[in-house]
Amino acid sequence: RIKPFSDMEKQAVSEGMLPFPENEEELYFGLKVIAADGRSALIPALKPERRALLESDLNRILHGLNEERKVKIGVFSPRLPFSPDGKGSAFASLAALLQEYYEVFEIPAGSSLVPQDISVVLALDPGRLPPVFAYALDQYVMRGGKVVFLVDPYSEVRHALQGYPPRPDAEMGEYLKTWGIDYHAERVAGDVLRGERVKGGDGRYRVYPLWFWAKGEDGRPLRFHTPGSLLAAENFADLHFSELAATGGQSGDIAAEKIRYASKTQVILDYNQDNKKRVLALLAEGKFRSHYRGGILDKAKSAQPYLPFAVRDAAVAVVADSDFAADELWVASRDPENPVYGIVPYAGNAAFLLGLIDRLSGRAVVPPSVSPEAPGAANIAETLYLKSAEKLREEKEKFDAKEAASSARLRRLKKSLTDSEDVSRRREIERAENENRRDRKALQNLERQIAAAADDRLELFVWLCFVVFPSGMLGLFFATAFFVRRRVRRQMMTLEKEK
């Protein structure tokens, strides 16, 4: 604990540490790692919710301090906002992580050259590639480049952004086919057994098969929304294929066109269950062949000379869901003032993508030993708590936002405070502290209310399971035994009379 306005607090703030409230006091509990050459890395606040990821965080920090320079990656996202600073984007959390761990280079749509010093290109929902860039990317791969495509037959993020349902991108299917990957852009994959329960217009909860959980090759739980499916094409002897993620063995699909204006209830009715596994993420490695028979940009000064075949091993990975990277599919909470180490994930989507980029770039970063569990692994108490929290979700979000705003205001005031400040400034800080304390108490009261509601549900569940249900079954058993015995006695009496 640090006393307010003390030299220790000023030092913590100047180092970039962020406080978090504990009862009515503020704690500064961060971590700064300093390398021998003077370079440093900072975790502004060690959040208890991220304790399972601490080993991974420290490993990445130490690995980064040992690197002479960051690995350079390129981001190509012509249709979805994905700025490296992570602002104003549905992918803000992933953008912040990429900015922290790599040197991020944004690739313009009209680029005629993808520099070979870019270790990995991340193409997010590229759609129909501009002809010039398509050639540049092709020649980048011919020279041993690595590309990660996030494609989508029905991007819900793009739907929300443009205001109308998107159409499938058949062009990407043709582009990827030349590199040995069959992308089924016209159909959306689903999994009923791992699907999420959603509330319909009639108030009833149903399993929506197009929103589901899957597991990666390392067992990490991954969340998908309306993904496509992939298949390794035949007759590509120079390529090695690896399945990175797939549905279970009892999956199905639906035509992408059918879900554009349909309700979730109608989608459930039209869904085709065929009990076949579908690959959701696929990696192809080896020597690829070019899409082109000649150099279409030979006269351009910036373009690479044409190569018909790859001169060294390259890699192309495809994830058939661009929404896979969006915050909504893997972020439980996020602290805007701590954009990297304030992210609390509930799914392994970002860890999957970071691990894939590390794998392709040759970065030997050890994956986290502990990954978030899928909701299906939650126990009864957690499930009841989530149901109670859902009823008070809007109220809790309001209190969360209010408490975060008052905490941010208080930190700004403290950070700008100097020894020469007058009494009125200190009183302003005291008022901000009192306001923040009231907001925290209101938030704590609401959390206690949620917990109490969950306890009541749990008590009712226990009463039903261990008292009412067993008593009912016991009563039914005795009643059945009584009527069976009486029937047998009547039959015996009837037989005696007949004798």
Each model region followed by its residue ranges:
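Juxtamembrane extramembrane loops of integral membrane proteins
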Residues: R1-A134, G342-I343, A381-E395, R412-K414, ...
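Detector for methionine-enriched segments
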Residues: M8, M17, M142, M172, ...
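Acidic, S/T/G-rich, low-cysteine, solvent-exposed domains in lumenal/extracellular/periplasmic regions
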Residues: E67, S83-S371
